[in-house]
């Protein structure tokens, strides 16, 4: 505490002290008779002394020593400041005023008492520094005291006054600490720090809330703590009082809706209560929803949740047994229930937050990362209920290290066998926290896996089934490799990989081992992870019909071998012009169209025939279901000329059945253009043609004529009104009749 300055002592106080010192001279001198009369003093000094004596006489029966000063500690959660108001307590009972007579026979006891009562006025603070000096010795305010502001020391509020405090209204009687709020000490000095310095306040600020979509918006001040969402309202005097408290364990779902300009946070409780929050901006609303979700997920990380609050109850020694029992019952009721989390990876969550990931385009993009005991997943912001965009097994993490290449001190790398994540946070401290959490989670996951594998007997490779081998291959498939299946990879350079192998993280390039580029992924590998294996690149085959084999890494070869027979390539969607430039592929698509037409006949016949067709084409049923869908094996067979003979063999079996079957042979068409009575079938593509709109079959020679499809004409005429039929000359030729109206379809 600073010492008193010279300017803080008023001249009136100095004169008053000189006046009080005169009593000491009277006590030390010889006792003799004195006549108390009127003394001549300056006018301003006389008024000051008379006022002091009058005020002292009014309160002489009150205990106005150091307990007469009551300090009110005001905390502001908005501006992180503390304001202290010095308030003098004025007692309710006024005593009878004393008067000094001219009688010289005053007892020495009464004189000493009067002198002591007057000298007690020196304890009043007359400046700001005086007020601060009395802080340590001043007793604390207790609820229920009657405060009087008629005797307040003057303080220059322009210099030290802060905005109105944001605090909860104190209730009368015993105040029970909420089991979900921060613990309080019996000594109120524990609350001297501002609320914003508490680590359990995750977010705070001003919002607008409403409890139903039809109600009006109300402005409020909100805080998210570790266990609760507090809503504060303002009264007429501007003070903020707690109006609602929502326990985070009772929140069932959190959704964010609205447009790009305005976002709303919708909160639904387990008891069907509804709360809607609106912030000043869309990003602020998203942040509120994110902080709520993080606080809910953090509840799963508190196994001794109930014992924490029982310890808080034990510290409150002044609670009665009845109140303590009530509080314990409330703790049992408010124990957080199991959260309804859609994704299994979100169980046992260790850490969540927003991180920035470096994309292929060398841009930093924000994602919501969730670290659990088994996975490290990335979600789209505000889309936490959906499936993760990226997901990695945490036990497969190879290394976690700082990344200082881009000039940021808050960048770090999380290295997995199939991918390298370059992440960035706002501060270096937060990056270090994420690194420590990932390393500890990976170590614990490896220890648990090793403990589980010890009692199990390892199977030999000879006894492993085909499904086990396929399952082991699926574990190596990643989203990054799958996205490059139909896209040409770009070489990003060794700098993007920090001059490390994408497989084993061994240093490569420059003076280290020679780097080898993978033609499929564009990543660089060492000579151990890249042994110059040759493979057809699907993207080069689709876009350039490049049938040559290129050098790929072991990872890429393993991935391509796994998806080799999977129908993942849609030629019509990726490059439809390929049918024009590659005759072999155009011939195959015609055969598949013919097989698709035969499928309709055989699947509408007896079940034995349909089962025979499935058996002949198994497991590639997509060949007659989606005619433009290919696997990498199919495209290689097209190049080698093996797919067309395979399809012709199946077509021969199906056509022989249709011609010989009494049921299927009756499902033919008659050319409505020539009407010669010959039965036509849609799979006879060499001699027939089919309407794209209605599916009618005609002769190929008849289709050359520019005559619209008669079946489509009939459908169009059925939609016309009666007035149209009166104008139509049905005796005329078909061309004249068709020319009288405009058809809404293309001519065949």
UniProtKB/Swiss-Prot annotation:
A zinc finger (Phorbol-ester/DAG-type) spans 656-709. The keyword Zinc applies. SMART domains: DUF4206, PH. It is found in: Cytoplasm; Golgi apparatus; Cell membrane. It holds the Pfam family RH_dom. GO terms for molecular function: zinc ion binding. Residues 129-140, 148-159 have a biased composition (Basic and acidic residues). Keywords: Cell membrane, Cytoplasm, Golgi apparatus, Membrane, Metal-binding, Repeat, Zinc, Zinc-finger. GO terms for cellular component: cytoplasm; Golgi apparatus; plasma membrane. Residues 200-297, 348-443 form the PH domain. Residues 88-107, 129-187 are annotated as: Disordered. May play a role during muscle differentiation. This is Pleckstrin homology domain-containing family M member 3.
